[in-house]
């Protein structure tokens, strides 16, 4: 049995809604910690002064940081309406895979 301390931290891709209704996409190993950083102005520079912020979507990524970075890149390439469909639960990442090919 593996030692739990040796297991890698799971990665997450997340979307934050800004006051101007824009969606920011990022990755982290701890969504609540990262969102708290964004709210305090210590996260991404792109979100500073854009509050109030709302965490609207997150997804665990099983295959580590590299896979999370690739998914983040793909989500950032989606249109606003496609991102909104993810947030609303009307679309799943696997349904959008056609767009990524």
Curated annotation (Swiss-Prot):
InterPro entries in the record: GIY-YIG_endonuc, GIY-YIG_endonuc_sf, UPF0213_domain
Membrane-crossing residues? none
Question: Where does the GIY-YIG domain lie?
Answer: 9-85
**In which family does this protein belong, per the annotation?**
Belongs to the UPF0213 family.
Provide the protein name. Answer: UPF0213 protein VC_A0739
Native organism is Vibrio cholerae serotype O1 (strain ATCC 39315 / El Tor Inaba N16961)
């Amino acid at each position: 049995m593996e030692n739990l301390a040796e297991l890698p931290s799971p990665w997450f891709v997340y979307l934050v809604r800004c006051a101007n209704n824009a969606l920011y996409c990022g990755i982290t190993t701890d969504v609540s910690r990262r969102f708290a950083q964004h709210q305090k102005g210590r996260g991404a520079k792109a979100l500073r002064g854009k509050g109030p912020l709302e965490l609207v979507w997150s997804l665990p990524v099983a295959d580590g940081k590299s896979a999370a970075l690739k998914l983040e890149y793909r989500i950032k390439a989606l249109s606003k309406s496609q991102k909104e469909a993810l947030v609303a639960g009307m679309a799943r990442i696997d349904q959008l895979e056609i767009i990524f090919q």
